[in-house]
Amino acid sequence: MKTIKITQIKSSIGRIPDHKKTLLGLGLRHIGHSVIRQDTPSIRGMIKKISYILKIQEE
């Protein structure tokens, strides 16, 4: 299965609480933090919800 590298590029300060929970659900904690996740529909939905905070790289 394909993987996606997700990097947080903006702060979570002042964001909607639901968006902060989505960041934590992806495993992101601070600016510049990157994680590698499987490319699944649920992960894609989380990315779409907070795409303005993230940088995505297909692997």
From Swiss-Prot:
Protein name: Large ribosomal subunit protein uL30
Bilayer-spanning residue ranges: none
Subunit-level organization: Part of the 50S ribosomal subunit.
A Gene Ontology cellular-component term: cytosolic large ribosomal subunit
Cystine pairs: none
Organism: Buchnera aphidicola subsp. Schizaphis graminum (strain Sg)
Pfam families: Ribosomal_L30
GO annotation, biological process: translation
Keyword Transmembrane listed: no
Phylogenetic lineage: Bacteria, Pseudomonadati, Pseudomonadota, Gammaproteobacteria, Enterobacterales
Family, as annotated: Belongs to the universal ribosomal protein uL30 family.
Keywords annotated in UniProt: Ribonucleoprotein, Ribosomal protein
Record keyword Glycosyltransferase present: no
GO molecular-function terms, A-Z: structural constituent of ribosome
